[in-house]
Amino acid sequence: MEGQTGSGKSIFLQNIITCLLQNKSTEITIIDPKGGGDFAVFREREKVEILDTSEAEAAIESFVEEMESRYQSNAQGVSYESMSYKILIIDEVNDLIKNKAISANIARLSRKARQSRIHLILATQRPDAKAFEGEIRSTIPSRIALSVQKSTESKIILDETGAEKLTGRGDMLIKLVSSSEMKHILGVKVGNIQAFLP
């Protein structure tokens, strides 16, 4: 997911988290280099953990370990359906994936984690072509672009231009794994998000 300042990216992430929390067994870890201010409304939720970048490498490594543990459990007869969903949200992922160890682990998760009910949401204001080349880019099946400054930024996320023409405030283009067709949608802003939290 990408979107410049004023695009509505943070609000859209808040909406996604609110929807995910409707499933009471879902556990969410948020890595936010800005200190979690955009996600403060979730800080007291039992199933939400908000971390800063100093804790990122260890947290991502723990997700890889959990993924491998789930594969081993499944090989011993435990069904994936009995496992809780674990969601890792990384805001401003550009800076983190310059770290080779972090980049390698994100690539492992993006390649293998879905079957074990572990999912990634990667967000950035300005995607970097070098940072997003290779395995991470090819194994992230669904893409969302809110408004960006340049057509080249749109192409990094969507493989085509168009996001540079969006108007901001939740205006977005989305490509889902279930469809090759790009959709133009408008996100919403919930006035009192607390009212929708379980």
Each model region followed by its residue ranges:
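P-loop NTPase nucleotide-binding/switch module
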Residues: V78
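P-loop NTPase catalytic phosphate-binding loop
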Residues: M1-A75, M83-I87, N94-T152, L158, ...
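RecA-like P-loop NTPase motor core
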Residues: V190, Q194-P198
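Tight coil/turn sites that cap or link beta-strands
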Residues: R169-G170
